[in-house]
Amino acid sequence: MRDNTQHYRELFLDDIPLMDVRAPVEYHKGAFPNTVNRPLMNDIERQKVGTSYKQHGQQAAIALGHELVCGALKAERLAAWKAFAEANPNGYLYCFRGGLRSQIVQQWLKQDAGIDYPRVIGGYKALRNFLFETTRAAVDECDFVLVGGLTGCGKTEVIAALDNSLDLEGHANHRGSSFGRRATPQPAQIDFENRLAIDILKKRHRGVGQFVLEDEGRIVGSCSLPLELYQGMQSYPLVWLEDAFEQRVERILRDYVIDLRSEFERVVGVEEGFAAFSAYLQKSLAGIVKRLGGERYQRLAAILVQALEEQGRDGSVDTHRGWIEGLLKEYYDPMYAFQRQSKEDRVEFRGNQAEVIGYLRQRQALRPS
């Protein structure tokens, strides 16, 4: 039998499969990549056992748990655990603290299925704390540089081109602006933090000591950046990405109109997808009505409605450029210009996409190992 493990680092570096035996309500609040939920108890059973524990103590709670999970129900759950163990012979199981629930699953697997399957000592809480410390240590020990620039200048493309970048928007599944929602949901806050920490862990394991981030606010959609990282971002050096206005319009048209329509249609089907995509754009514009002002909003909203009608009718996207240009000139560019004033003393390089990528690669190469 393989031993129970406290080698949290190796679990994440090697993408070891994990079986989470917590209740679904716990799992959906936050888990880890390469994890599946095969609960010992469902949400209602867990609630009953928890109440029993508070009122009558541990032994009564354990007895109730065995009473609730027995017979055909126990056999069904045991079959799910057995299937996971056989499909993932290098995996581990865990509960919240690595205590009774994971030990009971281990015992039942051994007694009823003849399978010795190891658990993660300390469970979910220990794994979570390890990842929290991974992010904190990186902020303390590594160098960071931010990529800034006007809306649509291609910051995401720079992040994708570098092997020492951390894609905050990718981990959050959100583009970070009022129009940043994707066709699929954002992860839970804890899942976002865990994904980011594992990315940091793997890159540091490869020898990365200098990370490139996009200059973001504290909130990316519904996901909040780790506080210590966000605080550091208020003083990190900044590289400013520049691009022509026309190119920025075309990039936004591609990302937020052409590609995003396709994304919605892949997820929910062609007809419903276009309707959802149209509603998303109009809702996003309405979300900044107070900042735009009533007259400006009405004008841009009318252009957007016309653009969507034309796109739905014959696929034309030309009219979309009208509201995109208006938003850039009248809203986003002035806002970014104002924000940039407070960051000007941190800008160490300016250039187009190729120049910025080249500079950041050279910056990484020159960093002492």
Curated annotation (Swiss-Prot):
Instruction: Fetch the InterPro entries from UniProt.
Output: P-loop_NTPase, Rhodanese-like_dom, Rhodanese-like_dom_sf, SelU
**Rhodanese domain: from which residue to which, for each copy?**
12-136
The protein's Enzyme Commission number: 2.9.1.3
Catalysed reaction equations from the record: 5-methylaminomethyl-2-thiouridine(34) in tRNA + selenophosphate + (2E)-geranyl diphosphate + H2O + H(+) = 5-methylaminomethyl-2-selenouridine(34) in tRNA + (2E)-thiogeraniol + phosphate + diphosphate; 5-methylaminomethyl-2-thiouridine(34) in tRNA + (2E)-geranyl diphosphate = 5-methylaminomethyl-S-(2E)-geranyl-thiouridine(34) in tRNA + diphosphate; 5-methylaminomethyl-S-(2E)-geranyl-thiouridine(34) in tRNA + selenophosphate + H(+) = 5-methylaminomethyl-2-(Se-phospho)selenouridine(34) in tRNA + (2E)-thiogeraniol; 5-methylaminomethyl-2-(Se-phospho)selenouridine(34) in tRNA + H2O = 5-methylaminomethyl-2-selenouridine(34) in tRNA + phosphate
Q: Which SUPFAM superfamilies match?
A: P-loop containing nucleoside triphosphate hydrolases (SSF52540), Rhodanese/Cell cycle control phosphatase (SSF52821)
Q: List the disulfide bonds.
A: none
What keyword terms does UniProt attach to this protein? Answer: Selenium, Transferase
What does UniProt give as the signal peptide span? none
* Gene3D superfamilies tied to this protein: Rhodanese-like domain (3.40.250.10)
The protein's GO terms of the molecular function aspect are: transferase activity, transferring alkyl or aryl (other than methyl) groups; tRNA 2-selenouridine synthase activity
Main function: Involved in the post-transcriptional modification of the uridine at the wobble position (U34) of tRNA(Lys), tRNA(Glu) and tRNA(Gln). Catalyzes the conversion of 2-thiouridine (S2U-RNA) to 2-selenouridine (Se2U-RNA). Acts in a two-step process involving geranylation of 2-thiouridine (S2U) to S-geranyl-2-thiouridine (geS2U) and subsequent selenation of the latter derivative to 2-selenouridine (Se2U) in the tRNA chain.
Q: Which family does it belong to?
A: Belongs to the SelU family.
How does this polypeptide assemble, per the annotation?
Answer: Monomer.
Q: What is this protein called?
A: tRNA 2-selenouridine synthase
Q: Which gene encodes it?
A: selU
